[in-house]
């Protein structure tokens, strides 16, 4: 399901089309998708965002040449502010990174600065970039989401089409503050309909949310077609509207595709800080 599958902003995307791979730096390969495309149907407007947050990208396949032609490799972390005008389409991001492969840069800082400049221009917003040598990750364990997993419920599931109404009247319990986790989030690319696999962490303070209803709601994304960032904002919006928590944070970490993973988080709590460690499937 998608309300904007044929939106004009999607017509020029390379996603889902045969493309040539370039190995010389080309910033024009980056393509933007307006965030308001999915936000307007959710009644989310840029002058009054109900959340703050970011899209955290991990760049696993990043290589360039130093000024003597010696290949360099790094793992990159990019944080794109959720208040930016656009999100960055992931296939175009991959093609853009490939264009670094045979391009010479003076030093690592030049690569960071190039990435930051180009991504900020494409997104029309704030971007933070950090590149890491591979030994930075020595002895770093696989991380887990903190919180209570809701996946092992003894329920029968027969419906997999998106349905926000599972959350209707789902918050009837006592006042609590808790962190819930599910690894059963699966949605599909808006354009190609390829599956996107993720884990989601929901931290809220408010009336206790029925866990069966919440799990059925998350499972209903299984046939849903949207980009990662849009799914997280939809989850946030639906929980906020239908469960009305006092505080809410939604954070999803998706498995990688094309050497990239995308990990969006949205919160209305000033105290929320997303953990950035890789999960088991990443």
UniProtKB/Swiss-Prot annotation:
GO terms for biological process: queuosine biosynthetic process; tRNA modification. Its main location: cytoplasm. GO terms for molecular function: preQ1 synthase activity. The keyword Flavoprotein does not apply. Its EC number is 1.7.1.13. The active site is at 189 (thioimide intermediate), 196 (proton donor). GO terms for cellular component: cytoplasm. It catalyses: 7-aminomethyl-7-carbaguanine + 2 NADP(+) = 7-cyano-7-deazaguanine + 2 NADPH + 3 H(+). Keywords: Cytoplasm, NADP, Oxidoreductase, Queuosine biosynthesis. It is found in: Cytoplasm. Catalyzes the NADPH-dependent reduction of 7-cyano-7-deazaguanine (preQ0) to 7-aminomethyl-7-deazaguanine (preQ1). This is NADPH-dependent 7-cyano-7-deazaguanine reductase. The gene is queF.
